[in-house]
Amino acid sequence: MYNFELKQLDATAAITETLNVIENFCETYKLENDFGTISLAMNDLLILIIENSDSKNLELAINFNLNNQQLAIQITSNQTLDNIMPALSNASPENNDQNIFVIKQLIDNISFDAENNQLLVEFDVK
């Protein structure tokens, strides 16, 4: 089992640090085949969150939990994530930006906790 938390990072630092953590655990746990999928989905998801934030003071806490054959990544924001939830929930090539559709296709499961401004993203890894 692997657990790591990035605490309250500004948004741009969150992207860099997230990719570093993903690279490290993929290397450590021999998940190189999953690196591209996870890193692309998380990079695009974090960019989507940044682009849809209400102010320049966006901070994110990101918790990584690798257990058995699943990687769960919890993203907690200091701002509401309400504006990206509908886009991700209804992702399709017809009604969304192509990047949103790609994010949704790469992630195995995504859930929202609007009350706590959290997203839980899950990837099945082998």
What are these regions (language model features)?
Residues M1-L40, E51:
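Bergerat-fold GHKL ATPase/HATPase_c domain
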Residues N52-I62, Q70, N116:
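G2-box/ATP-lid motif of Bergerat-fold
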Residues E32-E59, Q105:
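Conserved ATP-binding N-box helix of the HATPase_c
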Residues K7, N63-N65, Q74-T76, E122-D124:
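Residue-level recognition of well-ordered beta-strand positions that form the cores
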Residues M1-A13, S92, D97-K126:
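Flexible, glycine-/charge-rich segments associated with ATP-binding catalytic modules
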Residues N68-F101:
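Glycine-rich/acidic phosphate-handling loop/turn and adjacent ATP-lid/helix
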Residues I15, D82-I84, L119:
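Intrinsically disordered, low-complexity acidic/polar segments
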